[in-house]
Amino acid sequence: MSPAAAPLTLALSKGRIFEETMPLLAEAGIEVPENPESSRKLILPTSDPGLRLIIVRASDVPTYVQYGAADLGIAGKDVLIEHAAQQSGRLYQPIDLNIAKCRLCVAVRQDFDYQAAVHQGARLRVATKYVQSAREHFAAKGVHVDIIKLYGSMELAPLVGLADAIVDLVSTGGTLRANGLAAVEDVMPISSRLIVNQAALKTRGARLQPLIDAFRRASERIA
């Protein structure tokens, strides 16, 4: 099969983004018969023979799209900012799908006076996996910080003295409260966007553009 005739490949991550993408695909008339949560397959067919899904880590979605292993993908704004800080080359982001919404926030122990520390010019240790977003946020506010990169269990860092604060995604705040933390500052609202490989848009645009348009219509109807 020639590359031009091969199915389009959409990169998705498991979990909330996958779940909230399914109604958009359904609105576009595309069904996915297998659920990645129960299937071991990493390449999933769809009801449209011209489209397949690949299941990758959320942080890897932009890389698969940028290097052409996927023609398009869906990734959160948080992931895209971190990817752009580490990789040269820009990804085409035609649509904010307004799915998987949450906030990127600064959070501290409930007994820590964050505002007083900032006002006094204290140098804070901040744990996060969103290094670029955190660095830009604190620089814009003139707050002096040392960034500690972690990959998970962010809430633990202030509890054991590793950090004064964390920057992490927050939906309901339940996990923060359960661990004695509180959000004290919003960094930015987060939602997931459709991203497209720019070379594929040129070479396979006749097939990609209708799918992009279908995503746009579906997101507008569901919003």
From Swiss-Prot:
Its main location: cytoplasm. It is found in: Cytoplasm. GO terms for biological process: L-histidine biosynthetic process. Pathway: Amino-acid biosynthesis; L-histidine biosynthesis; L-histidine from 5-phospho-alpha-D-ribose 1-diphosphate: step 1/9. Gene3D superfamilies: Periplasmic binding protein-like II. One of its GO terms (molecular function) is ATP phosphoribosyltransferase activity. It catalyses: 1-(5-phospho-beta-D-ribosyl)-ATP + diphosphate = 5-phospho-alpha-D-ribose 1-diphosphate + ATP. Pfam families: HisG. Its EC number is 2.4.2.17. The keyword Glycosyltransferase applies. One of its GO terms (cellular component) is cytoplasm. It is an enzyme of class 2 (transferase). Keywords: Amino-acid biosynthesis, ATP-binding, Cytoplasm, Glycosyltransferase, Histidine biosynthesis, Nucleotide-binding, Transferase. The keyword Nucleotide-binding applies. PANTHER family: ATP PHOSPHORIBOSYLTRANSFERASE (PTHR21403:SF8), ATP PHOSPHORIBOSYLTRANSFERASE ATP-PRTASE (PTHR21403). Lacks the C-terminal regulatory region which is replaced by HisZ. Catalyzes the condensation of ATP and 5-phosphoribose 1-diphosphate to form N'-(5'-phosphoribosyl)-ATP (PR-ATP). Has a crucial role in the pathway because the rate of histidine biosynthesis seems to be controlled primarily by regulation of HisG enzymatic activity. Heteromultimer composed of HisG and HisZ subunits. Belongs to the ATP phosphoribosyltransferase family. Short subfamily. HAMAP family: HisG_Short (MF_01018). This is ATP phosphoribosyltransferase. It comes from Bordetella parapertussis (strain 12822 / ATCC BAA-587 / NCTC 13253).
